[in-house]
Swiss-Prot record:
<feature type="binding site">
    <location>
        <position position="54"/>
    </location>
    <ligand>
        <name>Zn(2+) 1</name>
    </ligand>
</feature>
<feature type="binding site">
    <location>
        <position position="172"/>
    </location>
    <ligand>
        <name>Zn(2+) 1</name>
    </ligand>
</feature>
<feature type="binding site">
    <location>
        <position position="48"/>
    </location>
    <ligand>
        <name>Zn(2+) 1</name>
    </ligand>
</feature>
<dbReference type="InterPro" id="IPR037175">
    <property type="entry name" value="KFase_sf"/>
</dbReference>
<dbReference type="GO" id="GO:0008270">
    <property type="term" value="F:zinc ion binding"/>
</dbReference>
<keyword id="KW-0479">Metal-binding</keyword>
<feature type="binding site">
    <location>
        <position position="160"/>
    </location>
    <ligand>
        <name>Zn(2+) 2</name>
    </ligand>
</feature>
<protein>
    <recommendedName>
        <fullName>Kynurenine formamidase</fullName>
        <ecNumber>3.5.1.9</ecNumber>
    </recommendedName>
</protein>
<comment type="function">
    <text>Catalyzes the hydrolysis of N-formyl-L-kynurenine to L-kynurenine, the second step in the kynurenine pathway of tryptophan degradation.</text>
</comment>
<dbReference type="GO" id="GO:0019441">
    <property type="term" value="P:L-tryptophan catabolic process to kynurenine"/>
</dbReference>
<comment type="similarity">
    <text>Belongs to the Cyclase 1 superfamily. KynB family.</text>
</comment>
<feature type="binding site">
    <location>
        <position position="52"/>
    </location>
    <ligand>
        <name>Zn(2+) 1</name>
    </ligand>
</feature>
<dbReference type="InterPro" id="IPR017484">
    <property type="entry name" value="Kynurenine_formamidase_bac"/>
</dbReference>
<feature type="binding site">
    <location>
        <position position="172"/>
    </location>
    <ligand>
        <name>Zn(2+) 2</name>
    </ligand>
</feature>
<comment type="subunit">
    <text>Homodimer.</text>
</comment>
<dbReference type="GO" id="GO:0004061">
    <property type="term" value="F:arylformamidase activity"/>
</dbReference>
<keyword id="KW-0862">Zinc</keyword>
Length: 209
């Protein structure tokens, strides 16, 4: 049986969120006890907390919401590339481009160890010309273990705009610590949330036999 890696962050009250956003929360409406046979709960989550997929609506007012995103980019063969040596931003020279050949999905590992316990303002972003080159090579989806493709304080979102121009899709907040670089099958479907600019995903990688 093929090995499966869960590359999703666990969602809980202390999961790091973007500065100024409310925390993830889980609450109970009912608990098993006398007169109640079931546990029933609800949750609140910022759409960009944890492992998530940005919908085009996030960076374009006329972009598709999570409910309207084509699912095909989120399923299929991918290349996982180690770019932990990049500093501040992944640049053209940080990537072994032979690893990208033929890949429609590319995941970038930037962290030595994923910061599960606290928000990291100094995460490694991705240069717009890297996105452009991915697009020219036929890449349909880019994923990263960082919180965003663009720096935290960016107002121009150059990488996101390059994604828009190439009609690519985005996964952010992946946990890639335990997965060796190489080729895998990716499955990371967004929820069908009408009007949402992003969605949580349960992202997995499956070993290709």
């Amino acid at each position: 049986m093929s090995r499966i890696w869960d590359i999703s962050q666990p969602l809980h009250a202390a999961v790091p969120v973007w500065p100024g956003e409310p925390a993830f929360s889980l609450h109970s409406h009912a608990v098993i006890g006398e007169g109640c046979p079931v546990n029933v709960g609800g949750m609140f989550t910022p759409l960009h907390a944890g492992t998530h997929g940005d919908a085009p609506l996030h960076y374009s007012n006329d972009g598709a919401s999570s409910a309207d995103c084509e699912l095909a980019p989120y399923i299929g063969p991918c290349a996982l590339i180690d770019v932990r040596h990049a500093r501040g931003r992944v640049e053209i020279g940080d990537i072994d481009w032979s690893c990208v050949d033929g890949a429609e999905r590319v995941l970038l590992r930037t962290y030595e160890q994923f910061p599960h316990e606290k928000w990291d303002s100094d995460f490694t972003a991705v240069a717009a010309d890297v996105i452009e080159r991915f697009g020219a090579m036929g890449v349909r989806l880019i994923g990263t273990d960082a919180a965003s493709l663009d720096p935290e304080q960016s107002k121009t979102l150059d990488a996101h705009q390059a994604v828009k121009a190439a009609d690519m899709r985005i996964l952010e907040g992946l946990v890639l610590d335990d997965v060796p670089p190489g080729r895998y099958e990716l499955i990371a479907l967004p929820l069908r949330i009408v009007g949402a600019d992003a969605s949580p995903v349960r992202a997995i990688l499956r070993e290709i036999a």
